[in-house]
Structure formats: C-alpha cells, structure tokens
Amino acid sequence: MTQHDTTLDETQIRIDLAAALRLSCREGWHEAVANHFSAAVSADGKKFLVNPRWVHWSRVKASDLVLCDADDAATMDRPDAPDPSAWAIHSALHRKLSQARVALHIHPPHATALAGLVDPTIKPIDQTTARFYNRMAYDMAFGGIATAEEEGERIADAIGDAKTVMMQNHGVTTLGETVAEAWDALYHLERAARTMVLAYSTGRELAVMGDNMAEDVAMEWEADRAQQLSHFNEMKRILDKEEPDYKD
C-alpha cells in the first residue's frame, strides 16, 4: 500500500494524529505503551493510520504511524503489524462506523475509574458533564482484552451511531470527523469523568440538572465547533515550541 492509494491529505492527518498522541501523553492519559489512536486517510474510511506497536507515545512521530487497510486480513502478518488490540478494535470501527473517521481509544485515569463502577454514567452536574448528556454509548458487556476481531466487532456494534463511548471495565473511545474533534471530545470526557469522581468522593448527593437544562447545555456545546479546532490548534502550538519533532 502506498500514499497514492489514499485520497485525503495523509501528511496533515499524520501530523495531527502524532500530535494527539503526544498531547495525550503529556496529559497523563496513556497507559504504558498500550492504547491506540487511528485516523482514516481514504474516502471510504477503510485505509487508516494507527500508532506503531508498543512505541511510547512521547516518542511517536508522524512518519512512525502505520498505514493499514481494514479489509486486509493479512495485516497482522506484516513486520510492522500494529498491536493486536489496535487491529481488532480499529479495523472494526473503520470498517463498520461511518462516523469513525478518527477513533481515539484510551484508558485515562478518571474515565477508567468511572468505567469501573456498576453505574458508569456521566451525569449532568456541571456544564462539562452536560456536554455528554444523551450523547454517549455505554458498552456494558466487556469481553476481555480485545485481541480477537470478534471483540472489535462487538465494540463497534455497541457504539452504534454515537461518537463517544464509555466502556465498562475497560476505558473510553471518542470518534470524530477530524483529529481535532475527537481529541477535544476526549479532553472534555476525561474532565467530565474527573468531576464525577471528585463529586462522588464527597459522599454527598449530586445536584443533577433537569433534562431540559442538560439538553440545552449539550446543544450549546454542539453549536460551538470552532472552539474544538482552536483548542487543538493551540495545543499543537505548544508542541511546535517544545516537541517539534512530532511532525517528522
């Protein structure tokens, strides 16, 4: 497979995905050399980039990202094969979900703590938690470490048409049209989870918004797409100054 097999700006997508990995590492969301981010580089979404197998996110560069085809059954036989879980999950997402142009799967501390509860629901108790009101899928049927393609298929089915999923006993995944959209959602999802964990830690009753207010706040978030792009671009400017090799 070569760059000529794709129809989108693969160079820019590589830079953005490498930036998302570096930024997530700086935030402390990564887990050793596991977890995985991917981004489609073809119009049908099936050709996608994913971070290289077991390379620490603080070191990943744009040129390191591995180009895969979701329909290529021989992918795991390649010398540069991605992590088995990355292939199982992301090949299914890019093959089955039209909204999965970008898929960020990770186990950040607060969201993963919330995923370990019997009820991992993010409740609308402030404006950030309300962003996700009625807009998340909840995968409540953890099937073990996702090294089998069947588990990836199950996860894709559980997500349905959502763009954000809380995966009980596992972690979270955000989807988007762009890396900026998916990363901004991930940032605010972890913030929302942190708010939930801190609120629960008080042992006091939560002040949950009414349905109408929560929906209004969520809609306001959806109307402010420009802020998502600005957020990601500002974070990339920090990398441009402090870790410019992410673009290499």
Kindly label every feature range from the protein language model.
Residues 1-248:
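Glycine-rich flexible loops
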